[in-house]
Each structure stands twice: as structure tokens, then as C-alpha cells.
């Protein structure tokens, strides 16, 4: 292919940096969040008020990390920096001040790619979307069908406050979902007089009944109100006025216990039209009175008061790394505060220093817990660059402080009109997490308050103004404007052409003339996420299939020789660049040196900049990370240019699969039910060959009987098995290994008990001490093979950190080349997935008029019912592009260039292709897009013309090699004695309830009995059966399954007298099997069923 890419549509301009969310948030944490926490937390004074400890937050500093990123990965360490902060200890009595810099813990740092390295593994902190703090008004129907209203004040942290009305028009308040309290009691407890309240309300007459109700209950003064409040909130404790005062203060007016946060204050001021200063983060009397006033206006249905929609993105905000980490630091500092107070009280006041008071452990533990085990800290999906990028842009409603899968209703998961341009309506998982895990739209960004914004061009009097920067609007601001979609047709000056434009206004669609439009979106791609925007002709696909297409692109395995798609959308290069998989030069200059491991760029000032390439490293998902230079010595490069291709990249663009020749036709039933028929060319030409790197690890531990040893001298092993081991017993790099081969020889000392009786006898006779060790070597698991790529040895002497009890750790990396084979899963970009059912020799594949055999045959029935017609457009556009020898970029949603534009474009391209010399056969106007193929086996043409073309097809990570599994005899579960399940446990296949019904239906009694007893958990029976098979004897009758005995014992433990009885009423002793058996079987065998009948034949 030549590299001239034809641009069918202008590509999305103004694409932001796609990992911005992560980096900006962590930067905010280092510059503000951490300092904020340290400042809020000081001063700490002891219980007598004599000593005060101040943290001077803005003077904190980070030391250089101990290891760089690569070193941290290699050593299984955390890429982290030590935090030091200046502390000032003031003795109030003597006026003495001690200042000291104190170590307060280690903080993991973000790498340039927006990830963290924790214990050698790359992790990503997923963004969380939660309800924004603020005040929310809702309506509910009571059981008589009357509508009541309520208002909730939700803080960032602290107690909820909920006001509600009832049928008698009384106002109540609940604190943290406790019992209802008359609202006026709370007003009086806060020290407000009746007039204070009434003056603030626009309709005091509604409130009058609440005042009377309070008077009727005899609560006339502030003191009585405080007592009543205490009784309701702390029932069972003796009430007191001072107790009530303190309770009220600590619940709502103490900044340490109650915090609306910056966002909460902003939202409350906005909703209730208040002017409380931004730094007042607790509740004020004004907030409470305005909330009551607003609620009364709702109740009386007076204009200006509106209910809130909690699923609107104006009421949900994103918490990114920085804020999640800040919350965790707060938890750690609160634990630290208790320790400091205790140490102040216990220690000698005169000799105390800040370093003695501050113990870094609680803070370190809190941060470690967050990165190691929080639901939002995830092992990075590194299958390919797109998977990595999408993972960093993921937005989850789950996690601490969020929703749970079980409780999340339909409304939360649904697409909301305010998602437009902010969250992708397509990319979300299938299954229980659908709608709870979303992806950020391509142009969206998160503002300082955590609300998602999306950009627009202003429209002045029907003319789109593209001068300067676009305007970013959050969801609640956008609701007030009339916004036109990004694919509106304009003339060269930017005037909107159509007479009526569909716009979104207040979450509704309406049509307005151009001069009424306020804003227009930047680009049609702005609505969808990065993965979805890589699907060409997306607008012709059903949303369910587009969802599968988006999700499956993330599972594509990087191939040996990646190939850019013939038909792309123009975002491929941006995805590759922002994923961090390709090295980029930061300076203008000339390439002065290139080899496989490094690239050197000399800038205009003569300074050299080194770029080191990754070679054959293992990713988190066992795929291969490898970078190949694409610049030559002497090339002139500009800042931001790609220097090398990463995995699944070609020419600086993302290339997840291969462009292959596809025909849509049935072929001998081999593509029934989405199966795929492929040509042998895919195997021989390594089109879909990928490299996978497996890591095997073994540690030599200290045991009770002495240390384990890594050695070549393994008992009872032939010399040829040790051929590839060095003198230490470790495999050599480059050796080819198969399943069962030794990678690292290890022997473990064995105790007296481990010896068989004959050995003990020999010992007793000869008195000779044999070498008491047993073979415990690391071997290649079943079904695996490959070439040893690297061996790493870690010992305490070298200063490596090893797990407790280990003296030495050896790691062996084995690489395999996996060619495509029957059972592998493949997919296109439009959700058209299938399993390979047969690999045909290329001479048997159907072939084109010019003799080219096709690569893949797909079933045409996969298209109509699934409604993903985009694949057909891609097929034909790819066919035209390959014949024109170019590549095409098609931006989705192309109706702005005219109706039916995709159709016309594809047709024009095909006609253009057929005008090339000798290519007239490429396009047949009578049967557009189809060709008459011939059968490779007979040479006869098929009955009907067939749609043929080039499509981008991916090989997915669900490889048959990782899934195929067989078991003969293996481990059993301890309690039920049934075989374990799963490949990792060497397990069996479950014969479930429905399978039992199937066998019962056919009356296959003996087969069924065998499956439920000797092949599963009849311990005695299975040993006898094995014995009988080995000796060629008939298999004895099965006994009682172990799980049945367990069931009996469980019922007996409930106190039920339960037993098994024969027809004669004699109890059967289920435990008799345990006695050592006599040689004569106590049960009849199959012989007694009369084998003579069979022998006569």
C-alpha cells in the first residue's frame, strides 16, 4: 500500500490530550490537595492545651524516587517518593518553639503515561462518578396518592439533612435518616426566633402550622428545643442542654466533622441563589432558611421552583485520582492525629521533638491500602494500546461512596440527555455492570469542580464563529442554550445552510431557524468515546453491535506484523500517540543514531536526547511489548513526532489487526452460527501470529527441616532432562522448552515421615543415610511450550527485597509464537465476531476473477438480523482503496455533506477504482459491490455474485490455547471429595442438574450412576474402579458418594435423626467403607449381572 491517505472527511480537530484527566488530577493533588489536607489537619493540641503541633503544609517536599520506572518494574518495587514536611512544636507554657523536618510516608508517583507502579505491576486509578454535594428537591407519592416534597442537603462529608412535608402541611426534618423532628424545633435549637424565620420566608402562612405544632408540644425556648433534639438523636441517654448544643454544633457547624466542599457550596449558592462566601464550607442559617423557603414554594407550586433530576450530569461529578487520594490521605492523617495526641499526653513535655510525635505508619498504611486494594485501583488492561488508553478514561459509578451493582436501578444505568458529548452512549460493558461503567467522550474534559464539560463553537446570527478557542460548557449551563449537533451543514463562510436546524434545548429536541441557535458542537465524533470513534461508518451500525465492536477492539492481540486499517476514521494516530506506547521526540532536531534499543535526537543547540526502546517485554496480559524504530539516521524530526512503533502500531498509527480479503457467502456449513472459514495463507504468512510472554516464578524458602536449594542435582532425573540447565540448575536463555520440562531445579529437604517403609528397612539394615531431599522443581505447565527469553535471579545478597522466608527467587520468561488456529476468536470492528471453524488450503478457497483466493469467508446471514451494515460499507470502501492503492479516512456521521453520503462516496470510489488500467472487473454497475467468484475445488462459478472486499479483522485475546483443557485423574475438593473445577486447578467438567435430567430422560441409568459415583466422589469406588481398569477386571459396583454422607452429617448436626434404610427396614451404616476391605468384594460386581449373555456372540 502506498502511504497516501485520502481524506474523505475533515478529521476531528481540537482533540485534547486523551490522558489529561489522570495527569491534571494528580498534578492538582501535588500542588494543592496534599497541602490542603496538611493545613486542615494542624494544629493538633494535647488534651490540656499546653502543646501545639503545626504542620507547615506548603513547605512539604518530595525526595527523588529510589528507583526509576523501569527499575521499579524489574525489582517488583513501588515507584514512589518520600514525603517530608516541616513541623513546628509550640510549648504554650514556656513559649519554646521547635522546628524540624519530619518524614511522613511514601507517596506513589504517577508515570508520564498516567499509571502507577505498585509492587512492580502497572495499575490505573479509575475515575469515579458520584452524586455531587448540594441541595436536592424531590417529590414522592404517599400511600394515599398525595404528592409530598422533600429537600436533602448532601455534604461532601458529614450528616445528611432532609426536610419533608406531610399531608397536614407540617414541615419535618430528619438528620441522617433518623426519626422525624418538627422543623421549627431545629430552628429554635439553632437560636433563631420565630420572627427571624418568618421574615425570611416568602410564604410564612404555610410555615405557621409548624410553629403552632412546636408550641403545642411545649417547646417554646432554645433550651427546650435542644433537649428535644438530643432526645430524638440520642434516644436512651439522659438529655442535657449543653449536650444538645454540642451535638448540633458537631453535626453541622464543625468544619472537621461537616464539610460541604467547594462544590457543595457552589451548588447550594447556585440553586438557592445565595451569596455565601466560597470558603464557608459548613451549613449556615441562611442555607437552612432558604431551603425551607424553596420547599414551601414547591409545595405551593409557585414559579421559579423546580425539582432536581439526580441522573443529570449537572448533579453528578467525577472524582479523579487526586481527589480519591486526598480523601485517603485524610483518613491516614486522622489516624495519625490520635497517635500524636496520645504521645503528647504520655511523653515528657520538655524533651519532646516533632519527630518523636509523628509516626508515618498510619499514613503509609492508608495510602498503601488505597493503591493495593481499593475497588478503583485496577490492574491495568494492557492487551493493546487502545485498551490501556480506554482504561485510563474509564468512569465508574461503583466503588467506595458510590453505588453497588445490586442496588443500582434502571434509571442510573440509562443514557441521559445530558450525557451528550460528555459520556459515551455506546461504550459500556455487557452484563451486570452495563451503564455503571462508562467511558469519557473524545472531547470531554473535567473542570475544577469535577463536572464534565464539552466544547462548542459560538453561533452569532446563524454564522458559526470558529475564531479563537471553543467554549466549554458543563451540563447545567448547556441546558439553558440551544445547541446544534456537530454535523450541521455550513457554507464556506460558516453560515448554517438549512432553514430549520434540530437543536437540543432543556433536554428536548426542537427545530429552530439558524439565527436562534446559540452553539454548535465541534465535531460529530465528540459524542462518542475513543474506542467507538475508531469504528468507520459507525452511523450504519446498531448500537448493541457498536458496543461489542468498541469492547472487542480492546481485546485485540498485538500481531507480529501489524497493518494499519485501509479504512480508518482519522483518530488512529492520536490514539497511538496518547496511549504512551510510542516514543515521541520533545524537541526539533536531527536523528543522529538509531539501533534496535535506542534512538538519539540531536537538537538545534547540539544537545543529545536519548530515547530507549522497549524490547520484548511482557505486558500485564502476557502480550508482547516491543518497539521498532521508524526513523533513519539523518532524518529531520519536529517536536511531537513519533520515532518508533509500539505494539499494535504501524507508521505511528494504531493497527490492531490485518486487512484481509473477505467474501460474504455460505461455504459447506462451515460458517454456520457465526463460525469463520479462513485460508491457510493466514497461518503460513504469519498474518495473525502473535507473541505471548509467560512468566514463571519459583522461590527457595527456609523450611523447618533446612533451606530449599536451587541446584542441578535432582534425585531420579535422567541426565538428558538436565541438558539445558546450567551449573546452578537454571535453564539457559534461548532453550526451547515443552510441557513438563524443568526450568529451575529445586530440592526440598524431607523429614523422616516422608519415607516409604522399604527405605526405612534399607536404612535400618545398612545404617546408611540417603540424601533426604525431594524434587520440587519449577516445570513448564501442561499445554505450554516456548523459548526461554530471559532469566532473572533475585537474592538477599544483591540487596533485592524478597518475600518473607525466601532466600532466592528465580523468574523465567518464556515466549511463544501463536499462529492462528481452529477455535481462536476473531472479530471485525462492527461487533461481527466468530470462532474459526476450519482452515482451508488456499487452492480450495473461492477465488476472484483475477485468480486471487479470498482469505476469509463469512456468513451473509450475520448481517441483516444484527443490523451492523457498517461492515458492508467498510468492505466495499476497503476494496476500492486497495485497488486504488491508497488508504481512506472516513469520519463517522457524514450526513453534513449531504444525504446518503456514505453510499455515494463508496460508489464513487468503486467507480474510480474500475477506471484504473486492467481493473474494469473490479466494479459491476449491474450488481454493484458484488463479483462472480469461482469455487477453488472445482473451478465452477458459484450460482450468485458475492460481496467481496477488504476489511480490518482482529484476532482477540480469547485464544483456544489458553482455554483447552483435559483431565484424567486429578485433585479433589476436601469436603465433598468431588473433582475441582477450572483449568488452573486441573479440574473436571461439571455434570449439573440439567445434564442429569438429560441422562434420566434417556434412561441411561448405569451411565448416570457411574458419573455420580466412581467418576466423582465415591472414594472407595473410584480407587477400586481404577484398580480394576489397570488389571483388566470388571468394574465393581459403586458405593455411596461422599457428598451424600456430608449431607447426612449436616442434617444430623441440625438435630434431625436421619438415616438410610434398606427395604427390610435395616439401617445402612454409611461409614462402613472406611474399615479396611476384605479381599472379597462385599458388593456384587457387574459380573453377577450375567456376563455370559455377552460372550455367546
Curated annotation (Swiss-Prot):
<dbReference type="InterPro" id="IPR007120">
    <property type="entry name" value="DNA-dir_RNAP_su2_dom"/>
</dbReference>
<dbReference type="InterPro" id="IPR015712">
    <property type="entry name" value="DNA-dir_RNA_pol_su2"/>
</dbReference>
<dbReference type="Pfam" id="PF00562">
    <property type="entry name" value="RNA_pol_Rpb2_6"/>
</dbReference>
<dbReference type="InterPro" id="IPR007642">
    <property type="entry name" value="RNA_pol_Rpb2_2"/>
</dbReference>
<dbReference type="Pfam" id="PF04565">
    <property type="entry name" value="RNA_pol_Rpb2_3"/>
</dbReference>
<dbReference type="InterPro" id="IPR010243">
    <property type="entry name" value="RNA_pol_bsu_bac"/>
</dbReference>
<dbReference type="InterPro" id="IPR007121">
    <property type="entry name" value="RNA_pol_bsu_CS"/>
</dbReference>
<keyword id="KW-0808">Transferase</keyword>
<dbReference type="Pfam" id="PF04563">
    <property type="entry name" value="RNA_pol_Rpb2_1"/>
</dbReference>
<dbReference type="InterPro" id="IPR037034">
    <property type="entry name" value="RNA_pol_Rpb2_2_sf"/>
</dbReference>
<comment type="subunit">
    <text>In cyanobacteria the RNAP catalytic core is composed of 2 alpha, 1 beta, 1 beta', 1 gamma and 1 omega subunit. When a sigma factor is associated with the core the holoenzyme is formed, which can initiate transcription.</text>
</comment>
<protein>
    <recommendedName>
        <fullName>DNA-directed RNA polymerase subunit beta</fullName>
        <ecNumber>2.7.7.6</ecNumber>
    </recommendedName>
</protein>
<dbReference type="Pfam" id="PF10385">
    <property type="entry name" value="RNA_pol_Rpb2_45"/>
</dbReference>
<dbReference type="GO" id="GO:0003899">
    <property type="term" value="F:DNA-directed RNA polymerase activity"/>
</dbReference>
<keyword id="KW-0240">DNA-directed RNA polymerase</keyword>
<dbReference type="Pfam" id="PF04560">
    <property type="entry name" value="RNA_pol_Rpb2_7"/>
</dbReference>
<dbReference type="InterPro" id="IPR007645">
    <property type="entry name" value="RNA_pol_Rpb2_3"/>
</dbReference>
<keyword id="KW-0548">Nucleotidyltransferase</keyword>
<feature type="region of interest" description="Disordered">
    <location>
        <begin position="1072"/>
        <end position="1097"/>
    </location>
</feature>
<dbReference type="GO" id="GO:0006351">
    <property type="term" value="P:DNA-templated transcription"/>
</dbReference>
<dbReference type="InterPro" id="IPR014724">
    <property type="entry name" value="RNA_pol_RPB2_OB-fold"/>
</dbReference>
<feature type="compositionally biased region" description="Polar residues">
    <location>
        <begin position="1077"/>
        <end position="1091"/>
    </location>
</feature>
<comment type="similarity">
    <text>Belongs to the RNA polymerase beta chain family.</text>
</comment>
<dbReference type="InterPro" id="IPR037033">
    <property type="entry name" value="DNA-dir_RNAP_su2_hyb_sf"/>
</dbReference>
<dbReference type="GO" id="GO:0032549">
    <property type="term" value="F:ribonucleoside binding"/>
</dbReference>
<keyword id="KW-0804">Transcription</keyword>
<comment type="function">
    <text>DNA-dependent RNA polymerase catalyzes the transcription of DNA into RNA using the four ribonucleoside triphosphates as substrates.</text>
</comment>
<dbReference type="GO" id="GO:0000428">
    <property type="term" value="C:DNA-directed RNA polymerase complex"/>
</dbReference>
<dbReference type="Pfam" id="PF04561">
    <property type="entry name" value="RNA_pol_Rpb2_2"/>
</dbReference>
<dbReference type="InterPro" id="IPR042107">
    <property type="entry name" value="DNA-dir_RNA_pol_bsu_ext_1_sf"/>
</dbReference>
<dbReference type="InterPro" id="IPR019462">
    <property type="entry name" value="DNA-dir_RNA_pol_bsu_external_1"/>
</dbReference>
<dbReference type="InterPro" id="IPR007641">
    <property type="entry name" value="RNA_pol_Rpb2_7"/>
</dbReference>
<dbReference type="GO" id="GO:0003677">
    <property type="term" value="F:DNA binding"/>
</dbReference>
<dbReference type="InterPro" id="IPR007644">
    <property type="entry name" value="RNA_pol_bsu_protrusion"/>
</dbReference>
Amino acid at each position: 500500500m502506498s502511504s497516501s491517505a485520502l481524506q474523505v472527511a475533515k478529521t476531528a480537530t481540537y482533540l485534547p490530550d486523551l490522558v489529561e484527566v489522570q495527569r491534571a488530577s494528580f498534578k492538582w493533588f501535588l500542588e494543592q490537595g496534599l497541602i490542603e489536607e496538611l493545613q486542615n489537619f494542624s494544629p493538633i493540641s494535647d488534651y490540656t492545651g499546653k502543646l501545639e503541633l503545626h504542620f507547615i503544609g506548603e513547605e512539604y517536599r518530595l525526595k527523588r524516587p529510589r528507583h526509576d520506572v523501569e527499575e521499579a518494574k524489574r525489582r517488583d518495587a513501588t515507584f514512589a517518593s518520600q514525603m517530608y514536611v516541616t513541623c513546628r512544636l509550640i510549648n504554650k507554657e514556656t513559649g519554646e518553639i521547635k522546628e524540624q523536618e519530619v518524614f511522613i510516608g511514601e507517596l506513589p508517583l504517577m508515570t508520564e503515561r498516567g499509571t502507577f507502579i505498585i509492587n512492580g505491576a502497572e495499575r490505573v486509578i479509575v475515575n469515579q462518578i458520584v452524586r455531587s454535594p448540594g441541595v436536592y428537591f424531590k417529590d414522592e407519592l404517599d400511600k394515599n396518592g398525595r404528592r409530598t416534597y422533600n429537600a436533602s442537603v448532601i455534604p461532601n462529608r458529614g450528616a445528611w439533612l432532609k426536610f419533608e412535608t406531610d399531608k397536614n402541611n407540617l414541615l419535618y426534618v430528619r438528620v441522617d435518616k433518623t426519626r422525624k423532628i418538627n422543623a421549627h424545633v431545629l430552628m429554635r435549637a439553632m437560636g433563631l426566633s420565630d420572627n427571624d424565620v418568618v421574615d425570611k420566608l416568602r410564604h410564612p402562612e404555610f410555615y405557621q402550622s409548624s410553629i403552632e405544632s412546636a408550641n403545642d408540644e411545649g417547646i417554646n425556648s432554645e433550651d427546650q428545643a435542644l433537649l428535644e433534639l438530643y432526645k430524638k438523636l440520642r434516644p436512651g441517654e439522659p438529655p442535657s442542654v449543653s449536650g444538645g448544643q454540642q451535638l448540633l454544633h458537631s453535626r453541622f457547624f464543625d468544619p472537621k466533622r461537616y464539610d460541604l466542599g467547594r462544590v457543595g457550596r457552589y451548588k447550594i449558592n447556585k440553586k438557592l441563589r445565595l451569596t455565601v462566601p466560597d470558603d464557608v464550607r459548613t451549613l449556615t442559617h441562611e442555607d437552612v432558611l432558604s431551603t425551607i423557603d424553596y420547599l414551601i414554594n414547591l409545595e405551593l407550586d409557585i414559579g421559579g421552583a423546580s425539582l432536581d433530576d439526580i441522573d443529570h450530569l449537572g448533579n453528578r461529578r467525577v472524582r479523579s485520582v487526586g481527589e480519591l487520594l486526598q480523601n485517603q490521605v485524610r483518613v491516614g492523617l486522622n489516624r495519625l492525629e490520635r497517635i500524636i495526641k496520645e504521645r503528647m499526653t504520655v511523653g515528657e513535655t520538655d524533651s519532646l521533638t516533632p519527630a518523636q510525635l509523628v509516626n508515618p505508619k498510619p499514613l503509609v498504611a492508608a495510602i498503601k491500602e488505597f493503591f493495593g486494594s481499593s475497588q478503583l485501583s485496577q490492574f491495568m488492561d494492557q492487551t493493546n494500546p487502545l485498551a490501556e488508553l480506554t482504561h485510563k478514561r474509564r468512569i465508574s459509578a461503583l466503588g467506595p461512596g458510590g453505588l453497588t451493582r445490586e442496588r443500582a436501578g434502571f434509571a442510573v444505568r440509562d443514557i441521559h440527555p445530558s450525557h451528550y458529548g460528555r459520556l459515551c452512549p455506546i461504550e459500556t460493558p455487557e452484563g451486570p455492570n452495563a451503564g455503571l461503567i462508562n467511558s469519557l467522550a473524545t472531547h470531554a474534559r473535567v473542570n475544577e469542580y469535577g463536572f464534565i464539560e464539552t466544547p462548542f463553537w459560538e453561533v452569532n446570527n446563524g454564522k458559526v464563529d470558529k475564531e479563537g478557542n471553543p467554549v466549554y460548557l458543563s451540563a447545567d449551563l448547556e441546558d439553558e442554550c440551544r445547541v446544534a449537533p456537530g454535523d450541521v451543514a455550513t457554507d464556506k463562510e460558516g453560515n448554517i445552510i438549512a432553514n430549520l436546524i434540530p437543536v437540543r434545548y432543556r433536554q428536548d429536541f426542537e427545530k429552530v431557524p439558524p439565527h436562534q441557535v446559540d452553539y454548535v458542537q465541534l465535531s460529530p465524533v465528540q459524542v462518542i468515546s475513543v474506542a467507538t470513534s475508531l469504528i468507520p461508518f459507525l452511523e450504519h451500525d446498531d448500537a448493541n453491535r457498536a458496543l461489542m465492536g468498541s469492547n472487542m477492539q480492546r481485546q485485540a492481540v498485538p500481531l507480529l506484523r501489524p497493518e494499519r486499517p485501509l479504512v480508518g476514521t482519522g483518530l488512529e494516530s492520536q490514539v497511538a500517540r496518547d496511549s504512551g506506547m510510542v516514543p515521541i521526540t520533545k524537541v526539533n532536531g536531527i536523528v543522529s543514531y538509531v539501533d534496535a534499543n535506542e534512538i538519539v535526537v540531536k537538537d538545534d543547540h547540539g544537545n543529545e536526547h536519548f530515547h530507549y526502546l522497549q524490547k520484548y517485554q511482557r505486558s500485564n496480559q502476557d502480550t508482547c511489548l516491543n518497539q521498532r524504530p521508524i526513523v533513519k539516521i539523518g532524518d529531520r524530526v519536529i517536536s511531537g513526532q513519533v520515532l518508533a512503533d509500539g505494539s499494535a502500531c504501524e507508521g505511528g498509527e494504531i493497527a490492531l489487526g490485518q486487512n484481509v480479503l473477505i467474501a460474504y457467502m455460505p461455504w459447506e456449513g462451515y460458517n454456520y452460527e457465526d463460525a469463520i472459514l479462513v485460508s491457510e495463507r493466514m497461518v503460513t504468512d504469519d498474518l495473525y501470529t502473535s507473541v505471548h510472554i509467560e512468566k514463571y516464578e519459583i522461590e527457595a524458602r527456609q523450611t523447618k527441616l533446612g533451606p530449599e536449594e536451587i541446584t542441578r542435582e535432582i534425585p531420579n532425573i535422567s541426565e538428558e532432562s538436565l541438558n539445558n540447565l546450567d551449573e546452578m540448575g537454571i535453564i539457559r536463555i534461548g532453550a526451547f522448552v515443552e510441557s513438563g520440562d524443568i526450568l529451575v531445579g529445586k530440592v526440598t529437604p524431607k523429614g523422616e515421615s516422608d519415607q516409604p517403609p522399604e527405605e526405612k528397612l534399607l536404612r535400618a539394615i545398612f545404617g546408611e543415610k540417603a540424601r533426604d531431599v525431594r524434587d520440587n522443581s519449577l516445570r513448564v505447565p501442561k499445554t505450554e511450550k516456548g523459548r526461554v527469553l530471559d532469566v532473572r535471579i533475585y537474592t538477599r545478597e544483591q540487596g533485592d527485597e524478597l518475600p518473607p522466608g525466601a532466600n532466592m527467587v528465580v523468574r523465567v520468561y518464556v515466549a511463544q509464537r501463536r499462529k492462528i488456529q481452529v477455535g481462536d476468536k476473531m472479530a471485525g470492528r462492527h461487533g461481527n465476531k466468530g470462532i474459526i471453524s476450519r482452515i482451508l488450503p488456499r487452492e480450495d478457497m473461492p477465488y476472484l476473477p483475477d485468480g486471487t483466493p479470498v482469505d476469509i469467508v463469512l456468513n451473509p446471514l450475520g448481517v441483516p438480523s444484527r443490523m451492523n451494515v457498517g461492515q458492508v460499507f467498510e468492505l466495499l470502501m476497503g476494496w476500492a482503496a486497495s485497488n486504488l492503492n491508497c488508504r481512506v479516512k472516513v469520519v463517522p456521521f457524514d450526513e453534513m455533506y449531504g444525504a446518503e453520503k456514505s453510499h455515494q462516496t463508496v460508489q464513487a470510489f468503486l467507480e474510480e477504482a474500475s477506471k484504473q488500467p486492467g481493473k474494469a472487473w473490479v466494479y459491476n454497475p449491474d450488481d454493484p459491490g458484488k463479483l462472480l467468484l469461482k469455487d477453488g475445488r472445482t473451478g465452477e462459478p458459484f450460482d450468485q455474485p458475492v460481496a467481496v472486499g477488504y476489511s480490518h479483522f482482529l484476532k482477540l485475546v480469547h485464544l483456544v490455547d489458553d482455554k483447552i483443557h483435559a483431565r484424567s485423574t486429578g485433585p479433589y475438593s476436601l469436603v465433598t471429595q468431588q473433582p475441582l473445577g477450572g483449568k488452573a486447578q486441573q479440574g473436571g467438567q461439571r455434570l449439573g442438574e440439567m445434564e442429569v435430567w438429560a441422562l434420566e430422560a434417556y434412561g441411561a441409568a448405569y451411565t448416570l450412576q457411574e458419573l455420580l459415583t466412581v467418576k466423582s466422589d465415591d472414594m472407595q469406588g473410584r480407587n477400586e474402579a481404577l484398580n480394576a481398569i489397570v488389571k483388566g477386571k470388571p468394574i465393581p459396583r459403586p458405593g455411596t458418594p461422599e457428598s451424600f454422607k456430608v449431607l447426612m452429617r449436616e442434617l444430623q448436626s441440625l438435630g434431625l435423626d436421619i438415616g438410610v434404610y434398606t427395604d427390610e427396614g435395616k439401617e445402612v451404616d454409611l461409614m462402613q467403607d472406611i474399615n479396611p476391605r476384605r479381599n472379597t468384594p462385599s458388593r456384587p460386581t457387574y459380573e453377577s449381572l450375567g456376563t455370559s449373555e455377552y460372550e455367546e456372540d
